[in-house]
Amino acid sequence: MGVRVKRFDLVRVKDSEAYKDSDFVAVEEPLNIRTCFEKCEDFAIIMRTPGDDKELSLGFLYSEGVINSIHDVEDIKQVENNVIEVKLNKPIGIRIRELIVNSSCGVCGRAFLYTLNILKSDLKVKREVIFSFPEKLREKQSVFNISGGLHATALFNPQGELLFIYEDVGRHNAVDKVVGRLLLEDKIPASNYIMQVSGRLGYEIVSKGIKAGIPIICGISAPTSLAIEIAEEAGLTLIGFLRGKSLNIYTHSERIY
């Protein structure tokens, strides 16, 4: 696992007084994802927080449509600190990327929209269970609690148990790590789980969840208009402004009682 935080010297100003200090900062480094079928080729370079690179790579390739399940992958190995190779059992059939994916937007610069899955899930969750998610998320954000600089995504079951959590400088990377974990456990479509994110609910976050078959996505901030529109179309329950004992249900409220 790579280093996730580094300490840097700084000048801190408080109450108009300046003094020398130091602080921990979240690490951001490139990850070169190479896909291998007959020969290995560079597929994408992702700016990310080191660690959980296997989950990130698998989730990213799934979101890109390169793989449909873990059964499309013969092997995955970290050949260097910032290079990972994914051996496939079929050619990828799509053009190799020609851009660096930055940590704030995975689809910036591309005219790319997912073909939406229509979610089929009878999952219903109590409001009181949903209300517990943000605090449970914060308690488990180990790197954020040190540096204050990472996004987090967690997966919960209907009883409110936090199953796993991933952090990254990129909010969509954290989602890809969750999806990658689901792939590794062969749990896609994830029709009996709820995903909680630490930030806003944009199109990309929501579409990745839909593709993984997750029927309920919650965030502590606002959704975008496109996120609401695709959630409605796909049958996703989208919850925003989840804070304390309040929340907004934007689509398919029938799953929350």
Swiss-Prot record:
- The residues responsible for catalysis, as annotated, are C105
GO biological process terms, alphabetically, are: Mo-molybdopterin cofactor biosynthetic process
Species of provenance = Saccharolobus solfataricus (strain ATCC 35092 / DSM 1617 / JCM 11322 / P2) (Sulfolobus solfataricus)
User: What the protein does?
Assistant: Required for formate dehydrogenase (FDH) activity. Acts as a sulfur carrier protein that transfers sulfur from IscS to the molybdenum cofactor prior to its insertion into FDH.
| A Pfam family assignment | FdhD-NarQ
Protein name from the UniProt record: Sulfur carrier protein FdhD
Extract one GO molecular function annotation from the record.
sulfur carrier activity
Q: Tell me which domain of life the UniProt entry assigns to the organism this sequence originates from.
A: Archaea
Localisation per UniProt entry: Cytoplasm
Q: Which family does it belong to?
A: Belongs to the FdhD family.
**SUPFAM superfamilies assigned:** Cytidine deaminase-like
Query: Which NCBIfam families does UniProt cross-reference here?
Result: fdhD_narQ
**Keywords assigned by UniProt?**
Cytoplasm, Molybdenum cofactor biosynthesis
